[in-house]
């Protein structure tokens, strides 16, 4: 009996990850059987865990917090997106035994916004809240969609300035943000605990979409605040999660899943 193709997500913690359910839905669409597991790597033991996984027949891996930067350094080759992001969330084994690193977070976000939420990014003004790895990972792909303007706001201005210079966008201190944004995306680490960034409510008055990169209960405080402050549409990061997973799956298997039914399936769980 042939062993099933094996995939995994590496993180710490990782028990909460929804990646196994998502990838099993993709496999159903493709009409194949796969194995997809969660691997909690020790801090300091990530490289060894990845090496063991691929040496024992692993066919592809996702990488989540806190290992995305380490995965970048572990990869032998990088996609342009991964190079721009300085982080890797997808590892692809090559025939020569090397590992290629890619970053599908940006595609996950933009596909959810443009294809599922049906909101164009081209020509729009975008405000990014936060300047950590999650935000850095999506800027290169947002720029490919040719928005009129991207502004990054962060509690510590220096970090926002650093990203602004790197990507040729604008930076403002969180307290100085004022209105006129079509799309507002929350990527602050406070979002994970349901903390709302320190921003004035009037910035949401002409906002077509307020988006939180986290999903579920953690996104609720920010999205409620955005809705009450005038945002026309709000969305949590579930679609981004499914979208980045679909892009990873396509890199491993050459099959591009339809994310819409999988987003609906995950919402119903």
From Swiss-Prot:
It is an enzyme of class 1 (oxidoreductase). Its EC number is 1.1.1.25. NADP(+) binds at residues 80, 130-134, 154-159, 213, 237. The active site is at 68 (proton acceptor). GO terms for molecular function: NADP binding; shikimate 3-dehydrogenase (NADP+) activity. Gene3D superfamilies: Leucine Dehydrogenase, chain A, domain 1, NAD(P)-binding Rossmann-like Domain. Belongs to the shikimate dehydrogenase family. This is Shikimate dehydrogenase (NADP(+)). It comes from Neisseria meningitidis serogroup B (strain ATCC BAA-335 / MC58).
């Amino acid at each position: 009996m042939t062993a099933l193709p094996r995939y995994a997500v590496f993180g710490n913690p990782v028990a909460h990850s929804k990646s196994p359910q998502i990838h099993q839905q993709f496999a159903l669409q493709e009409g194949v059987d796969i194995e997809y597991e969660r691997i909690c790597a020790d801090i300091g033991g990530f490289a060894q865990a990845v090496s063991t996984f691929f040496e024992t027949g692993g066919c592809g891996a996702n990488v989540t917090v806190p290992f995305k930067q380490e995965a970048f350094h572990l990869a032998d080759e990088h996609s342009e997106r991964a190079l721009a992001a300085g982080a890797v969330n997808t590892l692809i084994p090559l025939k020569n035994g090397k590992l290629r690193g890619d970053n599908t977070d940006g595609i996950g976000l933009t596909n959810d916004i443009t294809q599922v939420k049906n909101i164009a990014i081209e020509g729009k003004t975008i405000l990014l809240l936060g300047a950590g790895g999650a935000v850095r990972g999506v800027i290169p792909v947002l720029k490919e969609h040719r928005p009129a303007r991207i502004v990054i706001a962060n509690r510590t201005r220096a970090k926002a300035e650093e990203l602004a210079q790197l990507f040729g966008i604008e930076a403002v201190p969180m307290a100085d943000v004022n209105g006129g944004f079509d799309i507002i995306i929350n990527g602050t680490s406070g979002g994970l605990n349901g903390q709302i960034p320190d921003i004035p409510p009037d910035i949401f008055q002409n906002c077509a979409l307020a988006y939180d990169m986290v999903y579920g209960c953690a996104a609720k405080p920010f999205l409620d605040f955005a809705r009450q402050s005038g945002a026309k549409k709000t969305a949590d990061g579930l679609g981004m999660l499914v979208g980045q997973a679909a892009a990873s799956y396509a890199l491993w298997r050459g099959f591009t899943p339809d994310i819409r039914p999988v987003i609906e399936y995950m919402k119903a769980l």
